[in-house]
Amino acid sequence: MENKKMKLWKKILIIVLILCAILAICIVRKFIIITNLVNEAKEYVNKTNYYAIVQSLQNGNVNMAKSYNKDGNYLNTIKNYGKDNQDERGLVKYKKDNEEIGIIYSGQEKIAILNETVLANISVVNIFSTFDNFLPRLQLAAMSRITTDNCGNIECYLIELDNWKMWVEKDTGLVIREINGGMVSERFYEFDIVKDEDIIKPDISDCKIQE
């Protein structure tokens, strides 16, 4: 009788060890994928020349952000189209050398703010570098599901965690599509193509000036 119990416990222990080994292999695989994406993304962390577009949809509201950046100078715009609001709303942020202009508008009403950093810069490049530290990487590897998928003919890793889905381009570590709860966003990037003439000073002739 004792021998039978011992054999049963050995079988259970072997099954548990096999399951633990499979789980460990899955976590290690995901950890390696995340690490590779972080390493790929490092090439883009300090890029100072890029053009980016971000389009997001949430509760029927559409936001379109565009950004031209070159060596510390930039022209950023955000436009918002609400399902219940026919007026276009948005903001413009311009910086070239020592000159800064911010424009906030809603319909025909426009306010220009000159040479004051009162509008936050628009962050449009989403780089998979948040998980640069070991512990966040390990947590994501343990809790997420990672598969391969195509997003707009781009080969990606699809990372899923609860209501959060993120498509990360395999070759760059750039996030090109994201679903977070009720918000869906898509991103497009081009690097090292922005010229000085792309950063056009906005016309403020029809704006109310706030200095």
Question: Where are the language model's segments positioned?
Answer:
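Gly/Pro-enriched, hydrophobic low-complexity segments
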Residues: I78-V92, T148-I209
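Generic detector of low-complexity/intrinsically disordered segments
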Residues: K10, I15, L19-A21, I25, ...
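Flexible, processing/modification-adjacent segments and terminal tails
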Residues: I27-V38, E43, N98-C156, E160-L161, ...
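Short, solvent-exposed secondary-structure boundary motifs
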Residues: V54-G60, L75-D87, T130-A141, E155-E160
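N-terminal leader/targeting segments and the immediate start of mature chains
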Residues: E2-L75, Y81, Q108-E109, D198-E211
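Residue-level marker of intrinsically disordered, low-complexity segments enriched
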Residues: I12, C20, Y51-A52, G60, ...
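An acidic-aromatic
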Residues: A65-S129, R177-F188
